[in-house]
Amino acid sequence: MEVPAAGRVPAEGAPTAAVAEVRCPGPAPLRLLEWRVAAGAAVRIGSVLAVFEAAASAQSSGASQSRVASGGCVRPARPERRLRSERAGVVRELCAQPGQVVAPGAVLVRLEGCSHPVVMKGLCAECGQDLTQLQSKNGKQQVPLSTATVSMVHSVPELMVSSEQAEQLGREDQQRLHRNRKLVLMVDLDQTLIHTTEQHCQQMSNKGIFHFQLGRGEPMLHTRLRPHCKDFLEKIAKLYELHVFTFGSRLYAHTIAGFLDPEKKLFSHRILSRDECIDPFSKTGNLRNLFPCGDSMVCIIDDREDVWKFAPNLITVKKYVYFQGTGDMNAPPGSRESQTRKKVNHSRGTEVSEPSPPVRDPEGVTQAPGVEPSNGLEKPARELNGSEAATPRDSPRPGKPDERDIWPPAQAPTSSQELAGAPEPQGSCAQGGRVAPGQRPAQGATGTDLDFDLSSDSESSSESEGTKSSSSASDGESEGKRGRQKPKAAPEGAGALAQGSSLEPGRPAAPSLPGEAEPGAHAPDKEPELGGQEEGERDGLCGLGNGCADRKEAETESQNSELSGVTAGESLDQSMEEEEEEDTDEDDHLIYLEEILVRVHTDYYAKYDRYLNKEIEEAPDIRKIVPELKSKVLADVAIIFSGLHPTNFPIEKTREHYHATALGAKILTRLVLSPDAPDRATHLIAARAGTEKVLQAQECGHLHVVNPDWLWSCLERWDKVEEQLFPLRDDHTKAQRENSPAAFPDREGVPPTALFHPMPVLPKAQPGPEVRIYDSNTGKLIRTGARGPPAPSSSLPIRQEPSSFRAVPPPQPQMFGEELPDAQDGEQPGPSRRKRQPSMSETMPLYTLCKEDLESMDKEVDDILGEGSDDSDSEKRRPEEQEEEPQPRKPGTRRERTLGAPASSERSAAGGRGPRGHKRKLNEEDAASESSRESSNEDEGSSSEADEMAKALEAELNDLM
């Protein structure tokens, strides 16, 4: 908007400033010789108003009017006195005539003080006075009279104008818009046209992603343009005057605007950022300043409704989420995104089946192996070193069906004639700024990659223009290939949910009908498609400036790069080292948003023409047109909800009720099954199957049972979509998106069950029904009873599979870095075969015993183990003596020799200070023979003293565990 130039007379009707009277100075009368100002002239501080001389010298002027000095020069007898202004203002009245003698203190001129209607950084544009440095005689700063309180220029909040001049400029803007038959569109950036993240982008070479820094030392930001963004802006700019309004910083807003509009043809200076916001929590505070005459011609598109306080002229946009785990980076303070940064699930469209299984890249994009990306941004790595320049992709291929043709007629918000006449949205909106590895920006090599290349400022415009025609033939092939890769319907047929477009919280896009996209529909075209892949990607370097690649645009990009802290080849050369992968971002919401805005524009000027013809008395207002068009979407629908919110919560406060009412639907609370009842429902929106309402509604043929995605799809398209595309399935609650607008979950999430708990919490073991066999001399546990697998020692349920503690054929993973012995079907001879369990300090650190208690218990265990070691030594020496004196009793000798093995093992473990309970393993033959021997000689080796010792040892070990 134009700003009044300095020196302009204040607008008529402005408040009258204080009028000051300038009086004749000095004690003696003065004669006025001449005026240096005229009535209506603007004066500044120090300007000469008049020239005087003393009145006494005027009486004797006839005799001695002048005298000759010694040098021969003539000078006046009395010096002239100049009257200077002490304040700035406008001369309203001259109270004396030249030649008149003015008495001391008489009024000479009446001066109206400057109202400072235009102020720039504290300086008045009318009088030039510095309003920040006015000092009064007592040293306190004066408060000057200034009427400049309105900031009308987006990016210059320091430029203030008076409210009267603001209204005058506002009326001029409205007249200009009416002459051009345009409206005003306030455009949000984050998650509306772009998606930005600070997270490391592993696929740095993904097409359509810009990598930049806002300053030295700042984190690298990665911005993805929404598909069809450039095409959307270029078409809407013909109907609307675009204004950018974002909660991002000023540098961020201008950098993103440079990506979207490098030639400054779409937004110009109309960029409003967080630094210019009056209210950091709301965007409505600046509307009064930007549009002093009201926002009756202003339409708003934003993904957030709260920041606009649910304004009636707001069109809610489906959130655009490309980077997983990142929401709105510039969300207002106190919002959910700024506090929790919750991960947003983003459903992406599925690809056409390929011979090899699809691969999921870290960005969450399903990609077909072996297919190079060709979405109109840049060439594959093998072609980027060539000399071909960027080529536009704005010309649609003749005969190629429009993307909107794949949707059912009931979903299209416009007529078939409008769809046929509308140009096809191109993929040129998804663009990326990168530099070929073999090129340096400072060398001026031919064919620098992109129209908007952050690292290039020496693009050759001549070669760029020369190669446009040569690559235009391959544009249609690349577009046709992407058209064939549209998502296919699910096997359920008409019951498939929408997956073809990116899903916004709670408002999914409906998929194509089953009959229109069969899995093998384009099978014959697969080989030509892959064969012409290289040719289809040769045009990949799509420009951001309407397909115009010239030097001026490259210079603009270079300036934006320097402003944002990205130097030539600093961060983008290395991004091309990785192999390009296909981008399958199938978000097409901007296509439907464009149709909605066209409908609003058409309806406004249809009413405006009627207003000019005196057919209607009231001028059209966007704030009434948007709700009126929106309320016609579901005007003949009666909705009843089931399972979307708690029963004790008022339904009027839910988002489903708010948006359904805005779409014109009638909300019912009681299900009426009679088809002839006047208050019967036509649609039942349920969150889960199996409820009483759902079972009753499914028996009625006139009632549509759909899931909540049907409502959000109607909202994002402003059209009643097909109910068959959104059936209610049993697993809908499980597959429900986390970013759904539904504010209340239907059920508490069940914690996931781990297949193997890394640190199971095992309380003190309880005596089980199994039989334990102990050694008669050492008191060690030899084995448990052969009544089946050993039961877990814990009686409390542990959140893991039962098989995680049992012996299974695959090797068990190591716990705490120790080797686990091989389990042998329940044969675990003693502590040497027992798995190490986590200690109390590892599982329950707050209940750990103190150091003194542990030392005391260790001492007791060492004493017990020492006694057992002495007994085992004596038992070991006994068979050695028996070998010297042969005896006929062989079973006894065999038994004693067998018992020597665990004793020596225990002695070596105690002497070497190894881990307690970590013993040498026995072979299967020893275990089998020992089991059979102990079963036959069990009664012979039992003693009361050994039993007491074994019980004491087991109790101590259980306490330690």
From Swiss-Prot:
<keyword id="KW-0904">Protein phosphatase</keyword>
<feature type="modified residue" description="Phosphoserine">
    <location>
        <position position="869"/>
    </location>
</feature>
<feature type="modified residue" description="Phosphoserine">
    <location>
        <position position="740"/>
    </location>
</feature>
<keyword id="KW-0539">Nucleus</keyword>
<dbReference type="GO" id="GO:0043231">
    <property type="term" value="C:intracellular membrane-bounded organelle"/>
</dbReference>
<dbReference type="GO" id="GO:0051233">
    <property type="term" value="C:spindle midzone"/>
</dbReference>
<feature type="region of interest" description="Disordered">
    <location>
        <begin position="780"/>
        <end position="949"/>
    </location>
</feature>
<dbReference type="GO" id="GO:0005813">
    <property type="term" value="C:centrosome"/>
</dbReference>
<feature type="modified residue" description="Phosphoserine">
    <location>
        <position position="872"/>
    </location>
</feature>
<comment type="function">
    <text>Processively dephosphorylates 'Ser-2' and 'Ser-5' of the heptad repeats YSPTSPS in the C-terminal domain of the largest RNA polymerase II subunit. This promotes the activity of RNA polymerase II. Plays a role in the exit from mitosis by dephosphorylating crucial mitotic substrates (USP44, CDC20 and WEE1) that are required for M-phase-promoting factor (MPF)/CDK1 inactivation.</text>
</comment>
<dbReference type="GO" id="GO:0032991">
    <property type="term" value="C:protein-containing complex"/>
</dbReference>
<feature type="compositionally biased region" description="Basic and acidic residues">
    <location>
        <begin position="850"/>
        <end position="859"/>
    </location>
</feature>
<dbReference type="GO" id="GO:0005737">
    <property type="term" value="C:cytoplasm"/>
</dbReference>
<feature type="compositionally biased region" description="Low complexity">
    <location>
        <begin position="463"/>
        <end position="475"/>
    </location>
</feature>
<dbReference type="Pfam" id="PF09309">
    <property type="entry name" value="FCP1_C"/>
</dbReference>
<dbReference type="InterPro" id="IPR011947">
    <property type="entry name" value="FCP1_euk"/>
</dbReference>
<feature type="domain" description="BRCT">
    <location>
        <begin position="629"/>
        <end position="728"/>
    </location>
</feature>
<feature type="modified residue" description="N6-acetyllysine">
    <location>
        <position position="780"/>
    </location>
</feature>
<comment type="subunit">
    <text>Homodimer. Interacts with GTF2F1. Interacts with WDR77, SNRPB and SNRNP70.</text>
</comment>
<protein>
    <recommendedName>
        <fullName>RNA polymerase II subunit A C-terminal domain phosphatase</fullName>
        <ecNumber>3.1.3.16</ecNumber>
    </recommendedName>
</protein>
<dbReference type="InterPro" id="IPR036412">
    <property type="entry name" value="HAD-like_sf"/>
</dbReference>
<dbReference type="GO" id="GO:0004721">
    <property type="term" value="F:phosphoprotein phosphatase activity"/>
</dbReference>
<dbReference type="GO" id="GO:0061052">
    <property type="term" value="P:negative regulation of cell growth involved in cardiac muscle cell development"/>
</dbReference>
<feature type="modified residue" description="Phosphoserine">
    <location>
        <position position="839"/>
    </location>
</feature>
<feature type="compositionally biased region" description="Acidic residues">
    <location>
        <begin position="575"/>
        <end position="588"/>
    </location>
</feature>
<feature type="compositionally biased region" description="Acidic residues">
    <location>
        <begin position="450"/>
        <end position="462"/>
    </location>
</feature>
<keyword id="KW-0206">Cytoskeleton</keyword>
<dbReference type="InterPro" id="IPR001357">
    <property type="entry name" value="BRCT_dom"/>
</dbReference>
<dbReference type="GO" id="GO:0010458">
    <property type="term" value="P:exit from mitosis"/>
</dbReference>
<dbReference type="InterPro" id="IPR015388">
    <property type="entry name" value="FCP1_C"/>
</dbReference>
<feature type="domain" description="FCP1 homology">
    <location>
        <begin position="178"/>
        <end position="344"/>
    </location>
</feature>
<feature type="region of interest" description="Disordered">
    <location>
        <begin position="328"/>
        <end position="589"/>
    </location>
</feature>
<dbReference type="GO" id="GO:0030496">
    <property type="term" value="C:midbody"/>
</dbReference>
<keyword id="KW-0898">Cataract</keyword>
<dbReference type="GO" id="GO:0001096">
    <property type="term" value="F:TFIIF-class transcription factor complex binding"/>
</dbReference>
<feature type="modified residue" description="Phosphoserine">
    <location>
        <position position="395"/>
    </location>
</feature>
<feature type="compositionally biased region" description="Polar residues">
    <location>
        <begin position="793"/>
        <end position="803"/>
    </location>
</feature>
<dbReference type="Pfam" id="PF03031">
    <property type="entry name" value="NIF"/>
</dbReference>
<feature type="modified residue" description="Phosphoserine">
    <location>
        <position position="674"/>
    </location>
</feature>
<dbReference type="GO" id="GO:0008420">
    <property type="term" value="F:RNA polymerase II CTD heptapeptide repeat phosphatase activity"/>
</dbReference>
<dbReference type="InterPro" id="IPR036420">
    <property type="entry name" value="BRCT_dom_sf"/>
</dbReference>
<dbReference type="GO" id="GO:0030957">
    <property type="term" value="F:Tat protein binding"/>
</dbReference>
